[in-house]
């Protein structure tokens, strides 16, 4: 599939449709009223399979599920100390959905000082907290989590960046893909593969996933800002997957000296 996409689906959808339809043809519906805190990621799915789309996000120290169409709020997780080695903040910096355990429903994946997943239960709106499990608590500065079948085994993997410095993590200036373990309910972490091994300096951000060179193997693209203390950023690049997806990939620079690049998205 010659397509590069990111989990920033709402941005992509809005950009595409706004160029086609006038603003007057769109009606705004408020799902979460304005208030304290920021919302950095929103995902949609019919979690209870009632035919209505629901929304999940994080804000104000919790992950919340909003049941469509009236958007009643159901907290499903509280960010508290002690669940991971890193103290969480009030909200995820990025998130996405993925059926981690193959049970047919969408689980929540978030990055909040730790990359984690919440298991969607049989009754997601029961009021019972969703089970929290760690994906990776050693990569740091993860501002993007996006899914894709990296090794072409028919199962989705997770792609995440780790832009913190050597004093913070041994996976500094890197981007990884994470393979779901055979027993995800029992595993303490996922299987990490570092494909951009210390050659993604600066503040790497949202990744694109697709077969750039048409060799049948999916590649990964990213951009990195270089302001606000991020050293050697301001670039766009893509990494070419080799025959062994678990080994470091070959980096190809697309552009340098770019002003605050963060997204790599397009159709080839």
Task: Please place each PLM-identified region on the residue numbering.
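Bacterial N-terminal signal peptides
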Residues: 8-19
């Amino acid at each position: 599939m010659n397509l590069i996409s990111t989990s920033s689906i709402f941005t992509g959808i809005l950009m595409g449709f706004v160029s086609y339809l006038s603003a007057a043809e769109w009606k705004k519906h408020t799902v979460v009223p304005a208030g304290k805190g920021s919302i950095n990621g929103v995902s949609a799915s019919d979690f209870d399979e009632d035919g209505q789309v629901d929304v999940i996000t994080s804000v104000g120290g919790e992950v919340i599920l909003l049941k469509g169409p009236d958007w009643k709020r159901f907290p499903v997780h509280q960010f508290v100390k002690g669940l991971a080695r890193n103290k969480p903040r009030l909200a995820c910096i990025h998130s996405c959905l993925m059926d981690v355990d193959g049970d047919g429903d969408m689980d929540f994946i978030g990055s909040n000082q730790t990359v984690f997943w919440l298991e969607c239960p049989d009754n997601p709106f029961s009021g019972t907290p969703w089970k929290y499990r760690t994906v990776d608590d050693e990569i740091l500065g993860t501002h993007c989590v996006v899914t894709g079948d990296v090794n072409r085994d028919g199962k989705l993997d997770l792609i995440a960046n780790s832009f913190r410095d050597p004093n913070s993590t041994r996976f500094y200036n890197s981007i990884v893909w994470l393979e779901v373990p055979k027993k995800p309910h029992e595993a303490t972490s996922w299987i990490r593969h570092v494909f951009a091994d210390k050659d993604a300096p600066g503040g790497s951000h949202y990744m694109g996933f697709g077969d750039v060179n048409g060799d049948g193997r999916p590649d990964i693209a990213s951009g990195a800002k270089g302001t606000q203390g991020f050293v050697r950023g301001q670039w766009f690049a893509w990494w070419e997957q080799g025959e062994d997806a678990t080994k470091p990939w070959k980096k190809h620079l697309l552009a340098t000296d770019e002003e605050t690049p963060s997204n790599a998205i397009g159709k080839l």
